[in-house]
Curated annotation (Swiss-Prot):
It is found in: Mitochondrion membrane. The gene is ND4L. The chain crosses the membrane at residues 18-38, 44-64. Belongs to the complex I subunit 4L family. Keywords: Electron transport, Membrane, Mitochondrion, NAD, Respiratory chain, Translocase, Transmembrane, Transmembrane helix, Transport, Ubiquinone. This is NADH-ubiquinone oxidoreductase chain 4L. It catalyses: a ubiquinone + NADH + 5 H(+)(in) = a ubiquinol + NAD(+) + 4 H(+)(out). It comes from Ascaris suum (Pig roundworm). Its main location: mitochondrion. Core subunit of the mitochondrial membrane respiratory chain NADH dehydrogenase (Complex I) that is believed to belong to the minimal assembly required for catalysis. Complex I functions in the transfer of electrons from NADH to the respiratory chain. The immediate electron acceptor for the enzyme is believed to be ubiquinone. It comes from the Eukaryota.
Length: 77
């Protein structure tokens, strides 16, 4: 439960930067993954795991796509 609280606080206070949004969403998915791992049956667990992997990959694609345009994601690399 502490991961959900920290990730929602991070999402609430640092919503202007794409990197922090992606990190917050990953922490939310990780905490939900830990929370629901014992309650879901095998098929729903597989679906949730695939959904979390696809959302992570799409988030990385969006971040790399934004890094091409310098400064559009408010990050300096």
């Amino acid at each position: 439960m502490i991961f959900i609280f920290i990730s929602f606080l991070s999402l609430f206070f640092k919503w202007q930067r794409l990197m922090f949004i992606l990190i917050s969403l990953e922490f939310i998915v990780m905490s939900l993954f830990i929370l629901f791992s014992g309650d879901l049956n095998e098929m729903m667990f597989f679906y949730f795991m695939c959904f979390s992997v696809v959302s992570s990959v799409l988030g990385m694609v969006v971040m790399v796509g934004n890094v091409k345009f310098y400064g559009s994601d408010l990050c300096l690399f």
